[in-house]
UniProtKB/Swiss-Prot annotation:
Record keywords, A-Z: Ribonucleoprotein, Ribosomal protein
Similarity section: Belongs to the bacterial ribosomal protein bS21 family.
Organism: Trichodesmium erythraeum (strain IMS101)
Stretches with biased composition (Basic residues): 44-62
Keyword rRNA processing: no
UniProt name for this protein: Small ribosomal subunit protein bS21
Gene it is expressed from: rpsU
GO terms classed as biological process: translation
Region of interest called Disordered, as start-end residue ranges on this chain: 43-62
Transmembrane segments: none
Length: 62
């Protein structure tokens, strides 16, 4: 869990920037987007197969 403690003379803007930086470093948004909707096992397999195809296509270029 990400948490930001406001300093004595710290503004809200700088604390918000720190919070956003911590959230992006923790990788919360991609995880949140991934779990937004339930993904059936078939959808998982399709997604992984598509990712594997993309990866193979990229590797074959070089």
């Amino acid at each position: 869990m990400t948490q930001v403690i406001l300093g004595e003379n710290e503004g809200i803007e700088s604390a918000l920037r720190r919070f956003k930086r911590q959230v992006s470093q923790a990788g919360i948004f991609p995880d949140m987007k991934k779990h937004r909707h339930f993904e059936t096992p078939i959808e998982k397999r399709k997604r992984k197969a598509m990712a594997l195809q993309k990866q193979r296509k990229r590797r074959s270029r070089y």
